[in-house]
Swiss-Prot record:
EC numbers for this chain: 4.1.1.37
PROSITE patterns per record: UROD_1, UROD_2
Compartments, record wording: Cytoplasm
Encoding gene (name): hemE
Residues carrying the site annotation Transition state stabilizer: 76
Protein name: Uroporphyrinogen decarboxylase
Residues holding substrate: 26-30, 76, 153, 208, 323
Species of origin: Prochlorococcus marinus (strain MIT 9303)
GO molecular function: uroporphyrinogen decarboxylase activity
Length: 352
């Protein structure tokens, strides 16, 4: 056993590890009282995520409470947008709002190439401070939104139930949408490189809304741009593990495996055994406990964790939820999740 690198990083690289690493999407957030107290003092989400002292403090809150094996930057997938010339705000209980949705060629041509060091230096500062603080006790994770999901937000102007506006663009003006997606792919790759250079050891790409696409449209509007991001990042940072997550991914799981990422993060609607069977053996898996289960009993939580880890045996596996932890989740149950996750291999025993 080597302690020269964090457990989660070694697992993500496919090395033999002493136990299954565990972290949680959205592990810093509204379910924690310390976060809610801080939010009451700083009600602007953008201030909380763009002030480096606040972002660092929030990123560290779950580590100080639960000691997960990964500490993820507290930020948002839309954080790079202003650096490209797209302003946004995040309204509590309503979500993101884009002041001027991007729907014309002139708007797309006016977008700026992202220069993260100039437009969002707070991200680099926080990642560096996190690395310094956690050392080898946890891996530092960075993340981005994938091109399709970013496009969905900026074209729709807000969260959507049916994505009618961006789908209208996709099917009426596909060349226009491809120009936007290509701009995002280049900028997001630049942003990921910046995160890695600043201290991120593992990075995750969220294509949250790609599950709204048919498989054929996924192949046209999402997968090529996911792959473009991966190819660009891997060309300069080949040893940094990359994770891909899509909410509602059951219909495109095999396609996700062809994007060049190292790990596929499964949502809870895919059985872990089925997910492993549908993906090439060289790919790792992450997940995939239903976040709603954390409203249940400790016994139920432990049972599902054991089930997920047992079914992932033989693969490189990072234990996580199948989606972000939900607001209102009892903190004691989050603690059960982390404590069980760290002990799950002992609960299962040595049987494969």
């Amino acid at each position: 056993m080597s302690d020269s690198q964090p457990l989660l990083l070694r697992a993500a690289r496919g090395e033999s590890v002493e136990r299954t690493p565990v972290w949680m999407m959205r592990q810093a957030g509204r379910y924690m009282k310390v976060y809610r107290d801080l939010r009451d003092r700083y009600p602007s989400f953008r201030e909380r995520s763009e002030n480096p002292d606040l972002s660092y403090q929030i990123s560290m809150q779950p580590f100080e409470a639960f000691q997960p094996d990964g500490v993820i930057l507290f930020s948002d997938i839309l954080t790079p947008l202003p650096g490209m010339g797209i302003d946004f705000d995040i309204v509590e209980s309503k979500g993101p709002l884009i002041q001027k949705p991007i729907r014309s060629l002139s708007q797309i041509e006016a977008l700026q190439p992202l220069e993260p060091n100039a437009t969002m230096p707070f991200v680099g500062e926080v990642l560096g401070r996190l690395r310094e603080s956690v050392g080898n006790r946890a891996a530092v994770l960075g993340f981005v939104g994938a091109p399709w999901t970013l496009a969905a937000y900026v074209v729709e102007g807000k969260s959507s139930k049916n994505y009618a506006v961006i789908k209208a663009m996709a099917f009426q003006q596909p060349d226009l949408l491809h120009r936007l997606l290509n701009h995002f792919a280049e900028s997001i790759a630049t942003y990921l490189r910046y995160q890695i250079d600043s201290g991120a050891q593992v990075v995750q790409m969220f294509d949250s809304w790609a599950g709204q696409l048919s498989p054929a449209d996924y192949d046209t509007f999402a997968a090529p741009y996911q792959k473009r991001v991966v190819d660009l990042v891997k060309s300069t940072h080949p040893d940094t593990p990359m994770i891909l997550y899509i909410s509602g991914s059951a219909g495109v799981l095999e396609r996700m495996g062809r994007t060049g990422v190292d790990i596929i993060s499964l949502d809870w609607t895919v059985d872990m055994a089925d997910g492993c069977a549908r993906l090439p053996e060289h790919l790792g898996v992450q997940g995939n406990v239903d976040p709603g289960l954390l409203f249940g009993t400790p016994e139920a939580i432990r049972e599902r964790i054991v089930d997920a880890v047992r079914k992932a045996r033989g693969r490189r596996h990072i234990l996580n939820l199948g989606h972000g932890i939900l607001p209102g989740t009892p903190e004691d149950n989050a603690k059960v999740f982390f404590e069980t996750g760290k002990n799950v291999d002992n609960l299962i025993g040595s049987a494969a």
